[in-house]
């Protein structure tokens, strides 16, 4: 069954190659780009399949040579080659199974990250800043760009709320597992007795969506303008450049005051609103799935406590996969790839198990 599926994909890839070279299709740039993307998505699977077929062929040849060989040294060499090819065969089978998993259509998209201080007051706001810095430092390591959409600071440098955009190839595929409640355990600077406090911060990761995916009618929004404010509500602008958009059907409210231009703030706010509406629709769809089919790793439930950052022990524990890392300082400086890789692997394993169960 697996080989039949791979042969079908290879044929599809070849058909797309022919279509992409067709001058009549090339004249329609939108259609041509769509076909190019479809082919690019299949290319990695086709390349793995071609290598797999070559490995199988080489194995067959080496086994036939071994059966006819009488020289001891040649036999040893052939046995080593067969062992190496057999190992590569197993590796490729696993790689191909992962490549054949249903792809999240949002994986290649840019993201909006929303971080809000939860339980813990000022300490939660300070940790919200720590998480903001962690994600922006990770983005730098990935050579992604970041842009603040809206920010509400506290007097001592914490963030009550920050919404920012991360632009980069595959940003959503790596950051989507960060949605949920992040818990911090540490001694606040203001705590004279040395008692450990527990605070929480909520993170939401939303894929960027375009106008076609989510249409917002003018009659469904109310737009208010006001003067931008800084620390403690101090006015930092003499014009009404800040924008607040209320989506009347859903009640969602988005504010943006980071830009000096009212028009730019409106554009940013609309982008965030569009992504929030998309997430709301996706969440409503996910809520309809039976509880026993919901993902262990999870990518969307903001009320789910997903991770604990324990400062005294220098550890980070992800509760979904039971992974603990003892490198808190470097983790908060953006060294989070090990955790992300583990979450991706766990998600893939779970999906493969579900696929196996459905095929039985």
UniProtKB/Swiss-Prot annotation:
Pfam families, alphabetized: PCRF, RF-1
Family: Belongs to the prokaryotic/mitochondrial release factor family.
Entry keyword set: Cytoplasm, Methylation, Protein biosynthesis
GO annotation, cellular component aspect: cytoplasm
An example molecular function term from Gene Ontology annotations: translation release factor activity, codon specific
Posttranslational mods: Methylated by PrmC. Methylation increases the termination efficiency of RF1.
Stated role: Peptide chain release factor 1 directs the termination of translation in response to the peptide chain termination codons UAG and UAA.
HAMAP family, A to Z: Rel_fac_1 (MF_00093)
Subcellular location: Cytoplasm
Record PTM N5-methylglutamine, positions in chain: 234
UniProt protein name: Peptide chain release factor 1
Gene: prfA
Natural source organism: Clostridium botulinum (strain Eklund 17B / Type B)
The keyword Protein biosynthesis is annotated on this UniProt entry: yes
Record has Protein biosynthesis as a keyword: yes
Predominant place of localization: cytoplasm
Highest taxon, organism lineage: Bacteria
């Amino acid at each position: 069954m697996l080989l039949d599926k791979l042969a079908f994909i290879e044929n599809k890839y070849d058909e797309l190659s022919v279509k992409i070279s067709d001058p009549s299709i090339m004249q329609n740039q939108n259609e041509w780009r769509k076909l190019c993307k479809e082919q690019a998505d299949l290319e990695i699977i086709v390349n793995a399949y071609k290598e797999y077929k070559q490995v199988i062929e080489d194995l067959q040849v080496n086994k036939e040579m071994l059966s006819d060989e009488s020289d001891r040294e040649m036999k040893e060499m052939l046995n080593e080659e067969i062992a190496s090819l057999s190992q590569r065969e197993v590796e490729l089978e696993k790689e191909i199974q992962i490549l054949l998993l249903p792809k999240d259509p949002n994986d290649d998209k840019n993201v909006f990250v929303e971080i809000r201080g939860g339980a813990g007051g000022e300490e939660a706001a300070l940790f919200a800043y720590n998480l903001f810095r962690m994600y922006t430092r990770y983005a730098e390591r990935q050579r992604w760009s970041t842009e603040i959409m809206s920010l509400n600071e506290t007097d001592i440098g914490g963030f009550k709320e920050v919404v920012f955009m991360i632009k980069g190839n595959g940003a959503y595929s790596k950051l989507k597992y960060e949605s949920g409640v992040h818990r911090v355990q540490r001694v606040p600077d203001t705590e004279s007795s040395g008692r450990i406090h527990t605070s929480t911060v909520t993170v939401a990761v939303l894929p960027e969506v375009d106008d076609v995916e989510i249409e917002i009618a003018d009659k469904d929004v109310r737009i208010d303008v006001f003067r931008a404010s800084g620390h403690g509500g101090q006015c930092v602008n003499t014009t009404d450049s800040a924008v607040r958009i209320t989506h009347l059907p859903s009640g969602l409210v988005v504010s943006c005051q980071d830009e000096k231009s009212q028009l730019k703030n409106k554009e940013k706010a609309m982008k965030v609103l569009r992504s929030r509406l998309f997430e709301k629709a996706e969440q409503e769809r996910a809520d309809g799935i039976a509880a026993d089919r919901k993902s262990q790793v999870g990518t969307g439930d903001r009320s789910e406590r997903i991770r604990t950052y324990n400062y005294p022990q220098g550890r980070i524990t992800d509760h979904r996969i039971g992974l603990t890392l003892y490198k808190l300082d470097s983790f908060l400086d953006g060294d989070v790839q090990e955790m992300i890789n583990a979450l991706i692997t766990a998600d893939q394993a779970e999906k493969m198990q579900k696929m196996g169960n459905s095929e039985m």
